[in-house]
Amino acid sequence: MIYLKNKEDVIRMEGTIVEALPNAMFRVQLDNGFKVLAHVSGKMRKNFIRLVPGDRVVVELTIYDLTRGRIVYRKKLDSKGEEEILDDDE
């Protein structure tokens, strides 16, 4: 799923963390099959959001460099280990 932000030249995409790297960097495989190098956003760092390989995340990519991104959200899993589906209406 691709989201476009209006205020910046940013593309949001969903993916899965494949590998944890030093300095809070992660290799993320996007839903379209591409792998990108992503770092954790400042708010996630500040709130001590832990990321491990296998987590579903939302990554922001700039239109200028599609090989690097910023992880802005970790998807929540329900009790069965499946991704919760959130309605846009709520």
Curated annotation (Swiss-Prot):
Keywords (A to Z) from UniProt: Cytoplasm, Initiation factor, Protein biosynthesis, RNA-binding, rRNA-binding
Protein name in the entry: Translation initiation factor IF-1
Main location: cytoplasm
Keyword rRNA-binding listed: yes
Any matching Pfam family: eIF-1a
Protein location: Cytoplasm
InterPro entries hit by this protein: NA-bd_OB-fold (IPR012340), RNA-binding_domain_S1_IF1 (IPR006196), S1_domain (IPR003029), TIF_IF1 (IPR004368)
The keyword Metal-binding is annotated on this UniProt entry: no
Reported function: One of the essential components for the initiation of protein synthesis. Stabilizes the binding of IF-2 and IF-3 on the 30S subunit to which N-formylmethionyl-tRNA(fMet) subsequently binds. Helps modulate mRNA selection, yielding the 30S pre-initiation complex (PIC). Upon addition of the 50S ribosomal subunit IF-1, IF-2 and IF-3 are released leaving the mature 70S translation initiation complex.
UniProt source species: Fervidobacterium nodosum (strain ATCC 35602 / DSM 5306 / Rt17-B1)
A cellular component term, taken from the record's GO annotations: cytosol
Subunit structure: Component of the 30S ribosomal translation pre-initiation complex which assembles on the 30S ribosome in the order IF-2 and IF-3, IF-1 and N-formylmethionyl-tRNA(fMet); mRNA recruitment can occur at any time during PIC assembly.
Entry GO MF terms: ribosome binding; rRNA binding; translation initiation factor activity
Family per record: Belongs to the IF-1 family.
Residue ranges of coiled coil: none
Domain (S1-like) ranges: 7-76
